[in-house]
A protein has these predicted regions:
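Intrinsically disordered, low-complexity terminal regulatory regions
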Residues: 1-69
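Short loop/turn motifs at secondary-structure junctions and domain boundaries
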Residues: 47, 106-113
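Short glycine-rich loop/turn motifs
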Residues: 52, 113-114
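Regulatory sensory and allosteric helical modules in signal-transduction proteins
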Residues: 58-108
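Short hydrophobic beta-strand micro-motif common in sensory/regulatory domains
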Residues: 114-121
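Conserved small/polar residues in nucleotide/adenosyl-binding loops
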Residues: 126-127
């Protein structure tokens, strides 16, 4: 299976419109959650050129680094710490245009300037 998610249009709405059906096809038959997360990160980064895309998985009271695409990342983030830990603790999406203005920001990479964190609080990828 060879799939390219590179986009040629600069229109953001059009890019998402083109991405979604292709992405749904990519993950439609896969049952392994880690594999789906890995390809999700790769597809999003390729399609939109994001600096870093990835997942942290909950283990006890920490977020543990999961599948990602981009530069190296922090292995563990405690609940309520940094943008990711705060998003998880508050159960809400956080959009941070300037990470240097976010109290308690964890600088995993000095190249990262902004973050969008979407907590996936309960997820069942497939039922059978």
């Amino acid at each position: 299976m060879e799939t390219s998610f590179k986009q040629t249009t600069s229109n953001k709405v059009e890019r998402y419109r083109l991405f979604l059906p292709q992405f749904e096809l990519l993950i439609s038959d896969e049952k392994e959650e880690i594999s789906v997360l890995a390809n999700t990160a790769a597809a999003l980064r390729e399609a939109f050129g994001f600096f870093w895309v990835g997942f942290y998985l909950v283990k006890d009271d920490q977020l543990i680094l999961g599948p990602f695409q981009g530069s190296t990342a922090c292995y563990r983030i405690h609940k309520g710490k940094g943008v990711c830990g705060t998003s998880w603790a508050e159960a809400r999406t956080l959009i941070v245009p300037n990470v240097e203005q976010f109290p308690g920001h964890i600088a995993c990479s000095s190249l990262s300037r902004s973050e969008i964190v979407v907590p996936i609080l309960a997820c069942l990828l497939y039922t059978s």
